[in-house]
Amino acid sequence: MRMLMNNLDPDVAEHPDKLIVYGGRGQAARDWASFDAIVETLRRLKPDQTLLVQSGKPVGVVSTTEDSPRVLIANSNLVPHWGTQEVFDELAKKGLIMYGQMTAGSWIYIGTQGILQGTFETFAECGRVHFGSTGGGGGTLKGRLCVTGGCGGMGGAQPLAITLAGGTCLIADTDLSRLERRVRDRYLDEVIADGKWRSGEVEEWQSVKADASKHSATSSIDAAIDRAVAYAKQGKNLSIGVHANAVELLERMLERNITPDVLTDQTSSHDPLTGYVPVEFTHEQAALERERDAKRYVELSTASMERHVRAMVRLQDRGAIVFDYGNNIRQRALDHGFRDAFRFPGFVPAYIRPQFCLGRGPFRWVALSGDPRDIYVTDYEMLKLFPREESEYSSRMHDWILGCHKHPEALLAGKFDECEPRFAFQGLPARICWLGLGQRDKAGLMFNDLVKSGRVKAPIVIGRDHLDCGSVASPNRETEAMKDGSDAISDWAILNAMVNIASGSSWVSFHHGGGVGIGFSQHAGQVIVADGTDAAAKRLKRVLTNDPMMGVFRHADAGYADAAACAKRLNVDIPMTP
């Protein structure tokens, strides 16, 4: 119940009054009557009962066991032949279904931090792969201009992730309030809008102009481009948000013959109606047009997506490193007639899959006490549990956790009262940290011991994104270009949900359409509570071993040598050796 409410905290959700958490229209509950009924049922639920939630509506309570999940959630699921955006929208209008995104409808969204480390891992790997021996960056993005679009709940992680990886970020969004929110939460350094500039350090808007000596235009876009190019040349890891449509930004860069080093996009193209904003409209105009003529709006939206991807491919031809960041924009452009839409790769096959082969993925935890000190204690213990010298990934974990702190030396000394977050917690204090098979269970048991000993004030909730090593089938994202061609097989996501139910997760969810839109993905999530009891310890051991093990099973079966080696090293039981 606390996590459901946390999803709708005004500091967490994008539009809490509409029950929208993030990702266009990803909701926590179908409507307010359903929300109230869920809360009332959870209050009276017995330890051996399980609540069933169908697309954000509580539909039944069944007798189970104390080791069974307290809640089972199914969101947005449709029989494949009818799994289209059009059918979904009709059912949603009738109040029969809800879009759960990934962590919105599964009650484990923790704000932009939830995707931050994964975004950092992506951009850091991009630097290592493409700039390891050139430009003096030492395999980082130092001195590199990284351009992207979409600064919402997910895309808003990009500016901070890029700067943490050493780069300069230029990001466009049509919604000025999103850019201002990211500045407030210290994910974004500066904003340029309507010819004015401000930063987190300067609250008053100040006039800013483009360099008229270099070009005639004096728009905000030109001013933002000039500023970002200058920062990159100076090697400054700063981020600039420009209030503009991403299409306009990219086309202006083409006009000015400016090629970014890295280019991607996280606009809400997974949802052509309520997410993406066509280039013809401002953010405010788009809201009106959706209501006036939804069919025309979708046509304009997909046409803009084609134009968007064409600009990305043109910049790729000019030398930019371009990758798709999982919003399905390539598919939308392809469906609209652009045959070269898949010219650039997705981020998972390009940078992340080697980690999936090891059962690594986005492990997150939340302090139910609401006290940031509890997170600082867990950070400190995580650094002890996984020494830096243990592996390259442990070293990265140390850099990541310390990078989350404004005063890392205070954390290292165990002076928790002197710790401050580098970026703001949203809602309940939380942390994200990528861990693999053989690590997640250790962390979970350690958290349980902290609760038991009283070193933290209240239980800790442990969950993850549905974007994980063995929990999703998404041919245009997580399972793109699988070695054996099994991209579209969703048995694995279903098995993941069943394994987590059998293992004793506190709540388990199975969704359709997260990240890339209706018809393009199926995925499972799990959450488990460390309450300090011996019974919880047994569940934690099972769940946090079996959940990442599904990633090793999945990738070993697909023929990945790293996954097979991981299975052998950790004595994973695979009946038919790959």
Segments the model singles out, each with a brief description of its role:
Residues 1-118, 124-131, 135-137, 307, ...:
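N-terminal ligand-binding/catalytic initiation module
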Residues 9, 90, 97-100, 121, ...:
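Catalytic cofactor-binding cores of redox enzymes
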Residues 50-55, 73-75, 148, 171-172, ...:
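General beta-strand structural signal in soluble alpha/beta enzymes
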Residues 101-107, 111-121, 128, 142-145, ...:
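Catalytic or ion-translocation cores adjacent to nucleophile or general acid/base/metal-coordination motifs
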Residues 135-142, 232-236, 316-317, 455-456:
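Short helix-terminating capping/connector loops at secondary-structure junctions
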Residues 163-165, 254-259, 280-281, 338-341, ...:
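Short, solvent-exposed amphipathic alpha-helical segments in soluble enzyme
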Residues 190-192, 222-443:
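Core active-site phosphate/anionic-ligand binding loop and the adjoining beta-turn-alpha structural block
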Residues 196-198, 202-206:
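Short polybasic linear motifs
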